[in-house]
Structures are given as C-alpha cells and as structure tokens.
C-alpha cells in the first residue's frame, strides 16, 4: 500500500527481516537522496516524532538540514524540495563539515583555519573552515557503508560465511580497527554466527581485530589520501593554523579504533576525536537553527 509503518531506529530493527508485504528503504545513499518519495515520508515521520501536538494545526516548520559539501545544485534542490513537501516552511541547508565544527564547539567565524573530517555512512567530508566559510574541501563517496561492505565481502571470501549488512556493522563496532596493533586497547574477539556460503550449514567464526584491520586497510587509505589532498589545496597561512590546532574527526567513522593514531602517524598533524562524534553534525545544525540570524551566511 506504500504506507509508512516505521521510521528511524524502529525501521532499522526490521531491516533485512521483512516479508513480501513490507519493504525497508534507505532513502539516502552516498550522502544524497536515492528515493525522493521515501525521503519525504521519512521526514514527515521524523517530524511527527518530534511534534506531538494537536493534529488540527499542521506545523509549518523551520528546518536546518546538513548536506555534503560536494553536493551538486541538483542534489541540493532535491533536499530542499523534499523538506518543503514534508511541510518545511523555512528550509535552510548547511554543509555538514560546517555543522560538525559548530557542534564540536569551534568558533567558525574566527580568522583562523580549522580542519574537519566528517566520516558519515555514505560520504566523507573534509573541509578547512575560516571566517565562517569553507576555504577548501574534499568530499568523497567512501565512508562507513564501504567499511561495512568490505567486512561482508571479506567474511564471505575468507571464512565462507554469509553475513548480513547488520551483522557486518556489528563486527565493525565490536572489532573494527584501522591499526593492526592496538596494544592495551585491543578488543576481545567477536564470534560471528551465520550460514556456510556453500553448504548452508550453521557456522561459528571467531574474528579478531587484526584481520578486520587488514580487510579495511584499502578503504581507510582512501580516506587518508582525501585528507592529504585537501591539505595540499590549503593556503599556507591556514595550513599553519591547522598544524597548531590539529584536525577534528567527527561522524560515526571517527569511532573506528586507532583511526586518529593512524592518520596522525601518516600526516604528522595531531588528530582529535569530537566529544560525541555521532551527533556533532546534528548538534551543530541545532545550534544553527537557534541562531539563524547570526549564522545567516552559513545557510544556502
């Protein structure tokens, strides 16, 4: 019937467990809208969760939405249209690295350079921010989802065990690492249950963080190279500020064990992980929403 029955965490619980009458949809892929109608319905669902007032007056809302800094005009237009269809009255867009910087507590209007690396699910956003604007940026479609896909592929190839996307994500959370030597911070092995790819018999496979670090190596290297390429395009004065202030990591990908150390060793600049990396973009967008007049230049 194309009627929405769940959104957000509740829908995620159903993912890969549905029958023919229920579809689970990810409206966003690679940081951009993949399914316009589903995206609009998702926004309506999320608004309903927040706005639990009387149904008589449908709220006309002011919204701030984070978008990848590498978005094309068409992609930005799609986000704006989706929000307006879902009853957004004043729709403002903010680039995700800018929102992350505000959420981390950086003074984005200061005349000094700060670099943010925001590793989300679909895209990694790297931006140098100064005087309330983005001076140089690099947006790549390599991020958390790719790490999950790497693990799925590795388990199938190396251990002959079929794992779902959700199980691969659990492996990433429990034993994911960017380094093969974590010393005292090494997590315990994680036992993966799944069917054998060939015989379909049940299997139990213990997985250690070292093998996952090997399997994620290529994708992490792509993120490393993207950071280096953004630094190459940074004006020397701002570069000096970045060396002094360090580089901030935000987004779910920042939680990958040893990522900050690996990047630091490779690039020779200190890396800091945001206090609550998963929510720094949302926090920043919330602060921007309360200060629309002050941050008017951030919105597009």
Map each language-model feature to its residues.
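Nucleotide/phosphate-binding catalytic cleft detector across ATP-hydrolyzing
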Residues: 1-119, 127-247, 254-300
């Amino acid at each position: 019937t194309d009627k929405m029955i769940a959104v957000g965490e509740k829908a995620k619980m159903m993912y890969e467990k549905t029958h023919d009458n229920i579809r689970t949809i990810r409206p966003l892929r690679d940081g951009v809208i993949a399914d316009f109608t589903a995206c609009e319905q998702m926004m309506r669902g999320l608004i309903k969760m927040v706005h639990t007032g009387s149904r008589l007056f449908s709220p006309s809302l002011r919204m701030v939405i984070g978008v990848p800094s590498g978005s094309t005009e068409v992609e930005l237009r799609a986000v704006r249209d989706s929000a307006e269809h879902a009853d957004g009255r004043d729709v403002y867009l903010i680039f995700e690295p800018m929102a992350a910087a505000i959420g981390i507590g950086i003074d984005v209007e200061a005349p000094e350079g700060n670099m943010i690396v925001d590793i989300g699910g679909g895209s990694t956003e790297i931006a140098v921010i100064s005087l309330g604007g983005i001076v140089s940026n690099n947006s790549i479609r390599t991020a958390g989802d790719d790490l999950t896909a790497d693990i799925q592929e590795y388990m199938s190839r190396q251990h002959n065990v079929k794992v779902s996307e959700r199980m691969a994500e659990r492996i990433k959370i429990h034993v994911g690492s960017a380094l093969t030597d974590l010393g005292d911070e090494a997590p315990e092995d994680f036992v993966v249950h799944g069917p054998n790819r060939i015989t379909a018999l049940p299997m139990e496979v213990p997985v250690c963080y070292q093998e996952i670090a090997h399997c994620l190596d290529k994708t992490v290297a792509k993120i490393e190279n993207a950071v280096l390429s953004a630094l190459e395009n940074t004006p020397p004065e701002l570069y000096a500020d970045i060396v002094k202030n360090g580089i901030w990591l935000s987004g779910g990908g920042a939680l990958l064990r040893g990522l900050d150390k690996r990047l630091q060793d490779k690039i020779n600049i200190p890396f800091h992980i945001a206090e609550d990396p998963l929510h720094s973009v949302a926090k920043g967008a919330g602060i921007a929403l309360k200060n629309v007049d002050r941050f008017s230049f951030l919105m597009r």
